[in-house]
Amino acid sequence: MKIGVFVPIGNNGWLISTHAPQYMPTFELNKAIVQKAEHYHFDFALSMIKLRGFGGKTEFWDHNLESFTLMAGLAAVTSKIQIYATAATLTLPPAIVARMASTIDSISGGRFGVNLVTGWQKPEYDQMGMWPGDDYFASRYDYLTEYVQVLRDLWGTGRSDFKGDYFTMNDCRVSPRPSQPMKVICAGQSDAGMAFSAQHADYNFCFGKGVNTPTAFAPTAARMIQAAEKTGRDVGSYVLFMVIADETDEAARAKWEHYKAGADEEALAWLTEQSQKDTRSGSDTNVRQMADPTSAVNINMGTLVGSYASIARMLDEVASVPGTDGVLLTFDDFLAGIDAFGERIQPLMRCRDHIAPVTREVA
């Protein structure tokens, strides 16, 4: 099973709590995180894109770097780890994304890929006059299908004459082309999102579910298998989890309860409000899960809380779920968390027994 890190491109990572570590996103922080991840043989690093935050006492995600420029910088200071940036497709023409991706492919020596998102939070785009109207909620995967077709044309042949409802290419050119086939990933949990991934993506990201229920996402992975069977393609699931680890289960649980007790209710209310704006996509979208009050303090990603041995055992359970190709990890404290993962958790994982133990780097 592959291991990735979801780098904190926005302030405070993924904990919407006044009791969680409070920090701003910087290149130096993300550089340290990704270089540590590479040192411990993580397979990939991904950054999201967020153009407007949730506010509240913690100003959650009000402060964000930009994904492509951040990952270009990280590509230049790493040598092995795969690097993925996220394209907010409403804001960037596909021909520009194709050229930026080809550039970062050159910087990274073929280690780059693109995560495509349709956009769900209207204020991110409305503030720039770029929101196409609420009907977009129902047509966004039609838009994305045309978008990825243009990308594949340009990466594959260097030329596109695509004509569609959303994009018109007139002998559009991109050169140089990527040195390797460009990986495209998506994060679809709705039926439309999974159908898109089955047809066009190399991997599909999905949320883990619950606290210390590592296989609860299995029905989602099964749906992805079924969707991919219809297209005859192999599209594995990468599952998002937060790791909160300590020496003992009790110590880790105490941290988790402390974070929950400091939940930023104002920011969470904003998330809930935005999640209700999409009345066209059904009840199975990522944002609906994010706003569920069960564990909203970390946007309801799957959460693994326990001792280092307990975390290793639960991650092995994740790996046992059919269709699972990898996990995308966040941490309550990224730098300490990645060290703990590399030194204390990964060596105990059966699904990572091909990785030689690594000690902490000497500063």
Swiss-Prot record:
Pfam families: Bac_luciferase. Keywords: Flavoprotein, FMN, Monooxygenase, NADP, Oxidoreductase. SUPFAM superfamilies: Bacterial luciferase-like (SSF51679). Its EC number is 1.14.99.46. Belongs to the NtaA/SnaA/DszA monooxygenase family. RutA subfamily. The FMN-N(5)-oxide reacts spontaneously with NADH to produce FMN. Requires the flavin reductase RutF to regenerate FMN in vivo. PANTHER family: ALKANESULFONATE MONOOXYGENASE, ALKANESULFONATE MONOOXYGENASE-RELATED. This is Pyrimidine monooxygenase RutA. It comes from Klebsiella pneumoniae (strain 342). The gene is rutA.
